[in-house]
Amino acid sequence: MAVGDKITISVIKADIGGWPGHSRVHPQLVETAEDVLSKAVEDGTIIDFYVATCGDDLQLIMTHKRGVDSPDIHGLAWKAFEEATKVAKELGLYGAGQDLLKDAFSGNVRGMGPGVAEMEITLRKSEPVVTFHMDKTEPGAFNLPIFRMFADPFNTAGLIIDPKMHMGFRFEVWDILEHKRVILNTPEELYDLLALIGAKSRYVIKRVYPKPGHPIPENEPVAVVSTEKLYEVAGEYVGKDDPVAIVRAQSGLPALGEVLEPFAFPHLVSGWMRGSHNGPLMPVPMHQANPTRFDGPPRVVALGWQISPEGKLVGPVDLFDDPAFDYARQKALEITEYMRRHGPFEPHRLPLEEMEYTTLPGVLKRLTDRFEPIE
């Protein structure tokens, strides 16, 4: 491989057993996944890999030359999750295999439970990439930070002072209820974009693309987010979606610091305990991504990489392992305390329409026959 060649970066994650409860991943699950992926490097299926964790989610980060949605790569991830699930069951871990919602692999893990973010890119002379991993929240949790990275000049100075970025970017937004998508240009359609993505439980940013004239081809994503909703697959609540994202940085794109800056504000996201509460998103190093207080607060980990000319993953650098984010963590804890004091009341608890796929309807159904008309 060399500069100018195509390479694919795949991040595929699943919750296949918590230790204990929903708090973290047992080390034996990581080792099992590493064994499966090591063999895949030896047989040439993938170029390189890293197995990360965030909360109770096992995260597979892989580079290869097989493109997005490759049955070989998705099948490999499924095998790693299946083998790790066997270990989880032997250990009696909580929710063993809970994100594997189908019995057999059918060529693509989309719609089978795991979350997927992938991009096929043309390698630049230097290719800095950040993978983001969230726990106890939903795909819409990325809306605000991705918007700020690529469309907010108060966050990203490059939008003002870098000629390569000054034209703005294109946002691919998915309506995850109607299964439709729209492409919006910024800054021209900024207000239209915000009208959609502010409703983060329905409209989610799936990809960001450069505009024509940018050094990066306009059909190559510069950011991609997993958008799988577990309840749409299972038909009931089986866990929160815990999204992942891949973001490219530098040289006509947001600088590394501009990619990380949105997370200095611990904005409110949906998820937390039983997937039913709003709470702050706390940026943490990987060793602190173990949600315990009320199964939270929700966490985000940022891993930094350089992709070598051979497609190797040079890293990771645990980017939130930095005292510069201590204030964000402290603020997140203050917000956590404030929100928890609401107990079962909104706005800490999600509104009823967002509780449809939780266990609450089963409770409310018992009261249906006891309601009577008000005269």
Swiss-Prot record:
Mg(2+) 2 binds at residues 56-57, 135, 242. The keyword Transmembrane helix does not apply. Keywords: Carbohydrate metabolism, Gluconeogenesis, Hydrolase, Lyase, Magnesium, Metal-binding, Schiff base. Pfam families: FBPase_3 (PF01950). It comes from the Archaea. Dihydroxyacetone phosphate binds at residues 22, 136, 274, 295. Optimum pH is 8.0. Pathway: Carbohydrate biosynthesis; gluconeogenesis. Disruption phenotype: Cells lacking this gene cannot grow under gluconeogenic conditions while glycolytic growth is unimpaired, and the gene disruption results in the complete abolishment of intracellular FBPase activity. Induction: High levels of transcripts are detected in cells grown on pyruvate or amino acids, whereas no transcription is detected when starch is present in the medium, revealing a sugar-repressed gene expression. Mg(2+) 4 binds at residue 241. Mg(2+) 3 binds at residues 240-242. Activity is enhanced by dithioerythritol, and is slightly inhibited by fructose 2,6-bisphosphate. AMP does not inhibit the enzyme activity. GO terms for biological process: gluconeogenesis. Mg(2+) 1 binds at residues 15, 22, 56, 98. Its cofactor is Mg(2+). The active site is at 15 (proton acceptor), 237 (proton donor/acceptor), 240 (schiff-base intermediate with dhap). NCBIfam families: FBP_aldo_phos. Consists of a single catalytic domain, but remodels its active-site architecture via a large structural change to exhibit dual activities. Catalyzes two subsequent steps in gluconeogenesis: the aldol condensation of dihydroxyacetone phosphate (DHAP) and glyceraldehyde-3-phosphate (GA3P) to fructose-1,6-bisphosphate (FBP), and the dephosphorylation of FBP to fructose-6-phosphate (F6P). Does not display hydrolase activity against fructose 2,6-bisphosphate, fructose 6-phosphate, fructose 1-phosphate, glucose 6-phosphate, and glucose 1-phosphate. Exhibits only negligible activity on inositol-1-phosphate (IMP). Is essential for the growth of T.kodakaraensis under gluconeogenic conditions. Homooctamer; dimer of tetramers. Belongs to the FBP aldolase/phosphatase family. This is Fructose-1,6-bisphosphate aldolase/phosphatase. It comes from Thermococcus kodakarensis (strain ATCC BAA-918 / JCM 12380 / KOD1).
